[in-house]
Amino acid sequence: MNKIKSMHLMMLFVPLFWGGSFATAEHVLTEIPPITAATIRFGLAGCILIGIVFMKSEWNTSLLLKNWKGLLFVSLTGIFGYNVFFFMGLNYTSTLNGSLIIATMPVFVTLGAILFFKESWSTKVGMSLILSLIGVIVVITSGSMDTLMSLSFNKGDLLFIAALICGVLYSLTGKKVMRGVSPLLTTMSMTVLGTVFLAGLSLYEDGWGKVGAFSLQDG
């Protein structure tokens, strides 16, 4: 299996993890406030990533300082902004609405790359975007027009749209940032920075006292 096929195979796992985050987050939010939950999630991920970075000897202080503006931006959009709106949105809308909105992200990322980064456009790309959007709608609604027509939009949906915008901005700028910093070091630094911002905001939720009582069992 060549490198390109391996990358495509790895990309197939992305929507799997995205989908799983909705179900787990919905359960977690019944016991822990949203920003506190996001802080724990990325705090744990950040610790693991720091260990991996040092294991692979990829730490480079000079590169981090040189690219700090880009790293700060992807941290604020991809970790902080996206997850604040994502977790808060789950408090006000259904996972169906949320997943439908977020699932359109690849379409808007592709359009943004074509419009702002001059990536090539072709009929094949256009058809792929249309088919992927139709596929998302069909899968989530189980092919029922009644389900699609009965969707109503509320405060939670607007929060998910804000999360979508953050995700698109992160995806478009992340590629540029990684030209100067390795993907692993970029992911580690943005996760750690994002966790710091989330932790600061979580203090206003007063939810850390509930963490010790968190249960993994269904209520």
Predicted regions and their residues:
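Small-residue-rich packing faces within the transmembrane alpha-helices of Major Facilitator Superfamily
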Residues: 19, 43-47, 133, 168, ...
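Cytoplasmic-side transmembrane-helix entry/capping segments in multi-pass membrane proteins
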Residues: 66-74, 121-134, 181-190
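Membrane-interface helix termini and inter-helical loops of multi-pass transporters
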Residues: 23-34, 59-61, 88-91, 140-153, ...
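Specific transmembrane alpha-helical segments of multi-pass solute transporters/efflux pumps
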Residues: 17, 21-22, 50-102, 138
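Hydrophobic transmembrane alpha-helices of multi-pass small-molecule transport proteins
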Residues: 49, 112, 121-143, 191, ...
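Glycine-/small-residue-enriched transmembrane alpha-helix faces in small-molecule transporters
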Residues: 1-39, 149-176, 196-200
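Specific alpha-helical transmembrane segments that line the substrate/conduction pathway
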Residues: 36-47, 77, 86-129
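Loop-to-transmembrane-helix transition segments
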Residues: 6-16, 60-85, 155-163, 210-219
